[in-house]
Every structure is written in C-alpha cells, then in structure tokens.
Amino acid sequence: MNVYNKADSFSLESDSIKDVIHDYICWLSMTDEMRPSIGNVFKAMETFKIDAVRYYDGNIYDLAKDINAMSFDSFIRSLQNISSKKDKLTVYGTMGLLSIVVDINKGCDISNIKFAAGIIILMEYIFDNTDMSHLKVALYRRIQRRYPIDDDEEDR
C-alpha cells in the first residue's frame, strides 16, 4: 500500500486501476485516525461513493450493510446481491457501493483487514476487463477535472 494514497496524478498508459483500487480499499479499511492524508487519486476515488448514492434507488447504506465477505456463504450472497443490482448502480456506483461497505466496516483489528481482502476478491468477480477500463478512464478524467462526477455517457 501507500503507492497511490498521496499520488496526485494517474496515467492511462502506465498506472494500474487494480493497484489503485487495492490501495484505496486498504486505506479505507483503516480507522480515520490511522489513515494517512491523501492526494488527488484517492480524492477522485471518493467520488464513486456519490455515484452509488445517485444511481441506487433505495438507501445505499442499507444495501451496504447487507454486503459481507467474511464467510464463503455470505461472500456468494453478496456477489449475487450486487450482481442483481449492477444495472441500476452502473460500474461507478458499484465501485462506490463497495467503497462504502469497506468504510462502514473500517477498523484496526484483523477481521477488518480480512474484510477488506474479501471485498477486493469480490471486486475481482464483479468487475470484468471492460468495467476496469471504464473505471480507469473515469478516474483519469475526474482527476483531470478535479473530481467532478458528471462523466460522459461513453464512460459508463
């Protein structure tokens, strides 16, 4: 971790969106007191939470509380739950939802670290290469525009 948390720029050619997401999820899993300050890359990642709220019809925090990756059964139920709502949430909203899930469950003990690892694995199942490309371009554009979330339709 700590490669991207203070980064202010992101390159479409040389940076990995998966690495950014992994670092970001690890950062989110820390308590607020333990989190190091962040740069533009993570500030732009935070905007995906806004997408989750915007695109989900119900209370996104209720849905987030139902997501759990601590056991195999709960992992599968969470995967099915997110997959069934992915068309409503969009790729951006799904990224935001999973960010909210980790933020809700943050902490210092080992179970929070396992939880964050479970969410990272869950993302590997949910996001395909096309989704990752969309996230990469959206992140790049949000950094360039200093985080506005009004991405073009072609980004989705």
Curated annotation (Swiss-Prot):
Pfam families: Poxv_Bcl-2-like (PF06227). It comes from the Viruses. The keyword Ribosomal protein does not apply. Keywords: Early protein. Disulfide bonds: none annotated. Induction: Expressed in the early phase of the viral replicative cycle. InterPro entries: Poxvirus_Bcl-2-like (IPR022819), Poxvirus_sf (IPR043018). Prevents establishment of cellular antiviral state by blocking virus-induced phosphorylation and activation of interferon regulatory factors 3/IRF3 and 7/IRF7, transcription factors critical for the induction of interferons alpha and beta. This blockage is produced through the inhibition of host TBK1, by binding host TBK1 adapter proteins TBKBP1 and AZI2, thereby producing a strong inhibition of the phosphorylation and activation of IRF3 and IRF7. Also acts as an inhibitor of the cellular response to type I IFN by interacting with host STAT2. Belongs to the orthopoxvirus OPG029 family. Interacts with host TANK, TBKBP1 and AZI2; these interactions prevent interferon production. Interacts with host STAT2. This is IFN signaling evasion protein OPG029. It comes from Variola virus (isolate Human/India/Ind3/1967) (VARV). The gene is OPG029.
